[in-house]
Every structure is written in C-alpha cells, then in structure tokens.
Regions:
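N-terminal active-site segment of His-dependent metallophosphoesterases
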Residues: 1-40
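Glycine-rich phosphate-binding loops of nucleotide-dependent enzymes
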Residues: 35-39, 44-283
Length: 283
C-alpha cells in the first residue's frame, strides 16, 4: 500500500470534549515506517483513523492513489488493513489457535472446524518463524509471546498494510528484539508496516523511514540510514538553536541508546538468520 494523508485531517478522540487537529501532507511509501513524537503529538490518533477505529471529522485518506472511507475496523480488515493496538484482549481459558480465531471461527456446515483453524494457525506462526505451539494455553505465554500471537492474528486475512501501536511497550530488551524480528519478516514479505514507537533503539533497528510528528503536524520524514538519534530527538523536542542541539548530542543517555541498539541489532540478526524458534509450531 501507498498511503497519502491530505492536510486538515480532524479526528475526535473518544471521551474528548473537542476535536483534535492532526495535519498531514505526506506520502508514506511501502516501507517499514516508524512514527515518533512526544506524548499527545497525534501518533496513535493517526493510525486509529487509518485502522477505522476513529472517524475523521474532515480531511481525506488515499490508498494506492484512491480516496477511501474507512468507517470501521471490520471495513479496514476487508480492505487489507490489519492493526494491533496496546492492551490486546485474550481469553486466558483458551489455547493459542482459539485466540487467533476469536470472533473469526471457521465453521463447516455450522460446526466449528478445529482442524482447519489449527492448520491455519500453524501457517501464520510459521510465517513469523515462531515456535509457539497452537495448542498452548494463552495464559501460559509470556508478555512477549502474547504480543507475537497478536501480530500473528493480523495475518489471518493476508493484509497488505499492518498498523502497530507500541508493539514493544513493556517488553524486555530480549523480548523486544524477538518481536522486532517478527516485524521485519512482515516487511520482508512485501507488506507495508506502520509502527508507532517511543523507543528509538527499536525504531532505528527495524525501520526504513522515520516520521516525526509534533503537535499534530508532520515535521519531517527521514530515511533511517541517513539520520541520527540526535536529529530525531531534536525534531521531537522542537530544538531550533545550535546550542540546544549540542546539549542533546552531549547527553550521556545517547551512549546507553547506542549500546541498547547494538544489542537489539545482534539479537534481531540472529533471529532472522536462524529463526526465533527452535521448531515449527506444533499442537
């Protein structure tokens, strides 16, 4: 998918008293795109609108050059758009396969077809090279494994665009690296991925482009290999002077970021080369 969001796109957050302006005049090419910005900048609002979770008051969304209306998550799913938001719900008394198909069960003549669902569940988990067993109770999985199941669930309808809202939130460095390896596989299969993420080491480890949003406006779109932590943080913070930029560049936190990114890069490389799991998904 190639996404174009035209200027003056408004969306009302649920429970909010007034409309929140988000202005975008950018092409998002078929890449693994990371959207970054401060809290309240409009990152999650943007992907909620594309996902059909929020409706724009006005403004336009174009997919592949055609103006579209996305009135619901169900319609987004039909259009080949899948999403994973924070706080995905699972039924702890069900296994992995049943959670993957929750609300989308396969039936044959009115009878639930567990064999077909298990087969399809193995297939989507194999796509991610995950060794999670389809018959495992979801309650037995770690936070990182649950996030993997949430990502696998997006693949059931073979989407062309996948939206991820903070996919590595609350994960350890090693868990994050494993989930990021799965996300890279989605991109390697030719799918477009748009990811909201606060953690810059994760952003730099997997993204092709970084979109910076500040106060509802896209302030820059950067090729990841051509930018730096300092430049992105300065843009997020609205730094305008050379002195302010130098203060950011000299911050000791950057050494920690660089070390964390190197660890993530090594872990992702190993996962991509050898597979994150040891075997194919089993019952």
């Amino acid at each position: 998918y190639r996404i174009v969001l035209i200027s003056d796109l408004h969306a009302k957050e649920f429970g909010a008293g007034n409309e929140k302006l988000i202005q975008y005049v950018k092409d998002l090419h078929p890449d693994l795109i990371a959207i970054v910005g401060d809290n309240g900048a409009g990152k999650s609002t943007l992907i909620k609108v594309i996902a059909g979770f929020l409706q724009p008051g006005f403004g336009h969304i174009y997919l592949n050059g055609e103006q579209v209306t996305i009135p619901s998550i169900r319609e987004a799913d039909r259009m080949g758009i899948a999403s994973v938001f924070q706080g995905q719900e699972f039924c702890d008394n069900l296994d992995v396969a049943s959670n993957l198909f929750l609300g989308k069960e396969i039936n044959q003549i009115g009878i639930r077809d567990d064999d077909s669902m298990n087969s399809r569940a193995r297939s989507v988990l194999k796509t991610l090279s995950s060794a999670i067993r389809v018959g495992s109770p979801i309650a037995s999985l770690s936070v990182g494994q649950r996030q993997t199941v949430a990502i696998a669930r997006t693949l059931l309808n073979d989407p062309q665009l996948i939206l991820l809202d903070e996919p590595t939130a609350a994960l350890s460095v090693m868990q994050s690296a494993e989930v990021l390896a799965y996300i890279k596989r989605l991109r390697s299969e030719g799918r477009s991925v748009v990811m909201v993420c606060h953690d810059l080491p994760d952003v730099f480890a997997v993204s092709d482009r970084i979109v910076v949003i500040r106060q509802g406006h896209v302030t820059g779109v950067h090729r990841t290999v051509e930018t730096s932590y300092e430049e992105i943080i300065a843009e997020i913070a609205g730094v305008t002077t050379e002195h302010e930029y130098e203060e950011i560049a000299e911050n000791p936190k950057f050494d920690s970021m660089v070390r964390q990114r190197k660890l993530i890069d090594r872990t992702i490389s190993a996962a991509v080369s050898h597979g994150t799991g040891h075997d194919s998904p089993l019952d």
